[in-house]
Amino acid sequence: MIKKYEACFLFKSEELEYKVALEDVKKQLTAFNASDFVENSLGERALEYSIRKQSRGRYEIIEFKMDSSNLKELEVQLRLIKNLLRYMILVKINKKVNVKKVKRRNFREFKDNRDTREKELPESTADVKVD
């Protein structure tokens, strides 16, 4: 069954390594009969923690259509690409979701209630005398 996927790839930040790895990813996608490519580059960013001694990486998002039976083999081949640090492939769902509007809490009421409680506390402690 052909499904629409969205994949996020994290490559090494060096320009040459990035381009070579991106071409390898595209070759693997075409080898597994992926079609309708939409690419979006998020550019180079600092990583929260180092991955394979890399502190920066380039992000690339690719949307494509592919037969779901080929997904496992594609993931095996993606693991073999040397300069690909991480990847994540998600199934893109185009269903409309009914969102129920939620009533917002009125924080002013909460603050007013808290202020009245704070005023009551000192009065109750004033009755007790400490020697």
From Swiss-Prot:
One of its GO terms (molecular function) is rRNA binding. CDD domains: bS6. SUPFAM superfamilies: Ribosomal protein S6. One of its GO terms (biological process) is translation. GO terms for cellular component: ribonucleoprotein complex; ribosome. Keywords: Ribonucleoprotein, Ribosomal protein, RNA-binding, rRNA-binding. Binds together with bS18 to 16S ribosomal RNA. HAMAP family: Ribosomal_bS6 (MF_00360). Belongs to the bacterial ribosomal protein bS6 family. This is Small ribosomal subunit protein bS6.
